[in-house]
C-alpha cells in the first residue's frame, strides 16, 4: 500500500469516512482535499444551507443536508462527494428499520479534534500539512521575491 493510502486506511479504521482522496500518477501520487475556499461554491449553491462557514473552515450540517449533489457539481476541485450512511427510520412507535441516507461529505479540517486534521497526524511521510491563508500568502510572496532576485540581472526591459 502506498503511504497516502496507509493514512486513509488508518483513519477509516476509526469508523471515519475519508475526506481525502489520492490521485495516482505513473511516478507520483498526490492528495486531493477540500481547499476550504474563501467564497465556497459548494456552500453558495446548497439549497438547504447545509454547508456552513465557521471561523476558518466549512462543514456540512448533516441534519440539513438532503444529498442532492448540487455541491458536488459546484466544487471546482472535485473534493465534494455524496455518501450513503445507515440510519434507523421509525415506521411506527414500535417499529424501526435500517435505511440509508445520502449526505454530502467534505473535509472540515477535523474541527472536532484538538490535535487537528487526522490525515496530517497519521501521514507516515509528513507530506500533509495545514497552514492558514496568511502563511500561504507569505510563502508565495517570499518565493516570488527569491525568484526575482535570482533572475534579476537577466531581466532587461
From Swiss-Prot:
4Fe-4S ferredoxin-type domain location: 24-55, 56-85, 100-133
Annotated residues for binding of [4Fe-4S] cluster 4: 46, 65, 68, 71
Keyword ATP-binding: no
Statement: the UniProt record of this protein carries the keyword Transferase: no
Residues where [4Fe-4S] cluster 2 binds: 107, 110, 119
Residues binding [4Fe-4S] cluster 1, per UniProt: 123
PROSITE patterns hit by this protein: 4FE4S_FER_1, 4FE4S_FER_2
InterPro entries: 4Fe4S_Fe-S-bd, 4Fe4S_Fe_S_CS, RnfB_subfamily
The name this protein goes by in its record: Frd operon probable iron-sulfur subunit A
Top-level taxon in the UniProt lineage: Bacteria
